[in-house]
């Protein structure tokens, strides 16, 4: 997958290219990331990249000309098939379903805003989609862009050591993940559930599915409203609810 990022702070993306899962993906050639800094497209000695908004008010906007030229350069490098995404609080909220949609693209251009944002006409003429990582305010689009890159890259074939790791992640099937345990078997009086030590793969599968369903019910019940549960899932969830009532 090819990713282009338009940002005033390209150095921040070393966290993506040099570390962890995404860093390994870059070193293997599975992920390519390039950055374009609007400052490199300015025409004044001060490399000005902000401008005052019409109508007044606090704050500044990103200057149109350097930003637009940087986007054009990124699009030219990406090719005609690239989708241009602006990271914005007004955008569609990023979910695992959205991540899966974006992962089908061979190339993406991510535009990171700063200051109070960008000229609306840039969004209208240069941007294909707006995406948000949540209902809160950040200082710029770089962290949301890195979040999107990390989540999308996990679905690129070969990036994870085992594809099952991605398939078992929270939200991959619309549910929260089940609890996980490693050594030691007992920690401060808390023991690993016996079923995980049994070696019975079918029992372990059912336990994990039940825990995933139960955790979703307790922590994010709204997620279940949009799911069509199978007969097995309904039975396991009912058993989970009964066990809670008995504990009470």
UniProtKB/Swiss-Prot annotation:
Keyword Methyltransferase: yes
Domain of life assignment: Bacteria
InterPro entries: Alpha/beta_knot_MTases, tRNA_m1G_MeTrfase_C_sf, tRNA_m1G_MeTrfase_TrmD, tRNA_m1G_MTases_N, tRNA_MeTrfase_TRMD/TRM10
Any one GO CC term of the record: cytosol
Keywords from the named record: Cytoplasm, Methyltransferase, S-adenosyl-L-methionine, Transferase, tRNA processing
Residues bound to S-adenosyl-L-methionine: 113, 133-138
GO molecular function, one term: tRNA (guanine(37)-N1)-methyltransferase activity
Disulfide feature: none
Role of this protein: Specifically methylates guanosine-37 in various tRNAs.
Quaternary structure annotation from Swiss-Prot or TrEMBL: Homodimer.
Family: Belongs to the RNA methyltransferase TrmD family.
Name of the featured protein: tRNA (guanine-N(1)-)-methyltransferase
Taxonomic source organism: Shewanella pealeana (strain ATCC 700345 / ANG-SQ1)
Taxonomic lineage: Bacteria, Pseudomonadati, Pseudomonadota, Gammaproteobacteria, Alteromonadales
Gene, per the UniProt record: trmD
């Amino acid at each position: 997958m090819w990713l282009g990022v338009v940002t005033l702070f390209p150095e921040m993306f070393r966290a993506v290219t040099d570390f962890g899962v995404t860093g390994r993906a870059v070193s293997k050639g599975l992920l390519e990331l390039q950055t374009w800094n609007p400052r490199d497209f300015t025409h004044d000695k001060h490399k000005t990249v902000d401008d005052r908004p019409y109508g007044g008010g606090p704050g500044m906007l990103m200057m149109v000309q350097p930003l637009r030229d940087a986007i054009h350069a990124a699009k030219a490098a990406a090719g005609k098939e690239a989708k241009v995404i602006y990271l914005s609080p007004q955008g569609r909220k990023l979910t695992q379903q959205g991540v899966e949609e974006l992962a089908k693209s061979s190339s993406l251009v991510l535009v990171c805003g700063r200051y109070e944002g960008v000229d609306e006409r840039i969004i209208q003429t240069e941007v294909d989609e707006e995406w948000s990582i949540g209902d809160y305010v950040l200082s710029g689009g770089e962290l949301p862009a890195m979040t999107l890159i990390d989540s999308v890259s996990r679905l690129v074939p070969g990036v994870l050591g085992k594809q099952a790791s991605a398939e078992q992640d929270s939200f991959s099937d619309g549910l929260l993940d089940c609890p996980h345990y490693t050594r030691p078997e007992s920690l401060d009086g808390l023991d690993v559930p016996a079923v995980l030590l049994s070696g019975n793969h079918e029992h372990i599968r059912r336990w994990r599915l039940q825990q995933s369903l139960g955790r979703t019910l307790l922590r994010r019940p709204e997620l279940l409203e949009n799911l069509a549960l199978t007969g097995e899932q309904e039975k396991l969830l009912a058993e989970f609810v009964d066990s809670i009532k008995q504990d009470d």
